[in-house]
């Protein structure tokens, strides 16, 4: 027996021994549970509608070396939300895109060696006014934040904050969470 996940990767492999009953077994028919299919995109249409008429913002995407980061970039670009600049090891970014069938045509890439360098270059782009926002890719949050709050980063005399959107299928609305791991004890 082989069981695979949604990406076709083997997660369990082994042998199953089936012991068939010697006598016929009858079981009462059970009522199946109700199945609900959620349209995840529909949950965000009201937020996307509020962006209509706004210009796409220049976005520095830091170390997008995984499928999710690249798909997010492409979808946000196609929706007219961002004009991305990918910052990271170009060969690795292009390899992931090719393996996942993601088209990066027309998207700028700044080739840097590793995630620390990507964070530093992305922060510099914002500081120089060449990007208006940062998007975290496949690097640790502390790598990005150490550049953001560093002496040559983006910090000011004001408090820094952030927000992330959690898609909770059992909650009827998008859930916005602020200050996770940034302001651990806000007043």
Q: What is the predicted role of each segment?
A:
Residues 1-38:
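HotDog/MaoC-like acyl-thioester-processing domains
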Residues 39-85, 89-187:
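Anion-binding alpha/beta catalytic cores of soluble intermediary-metabolism enzymes, centered on
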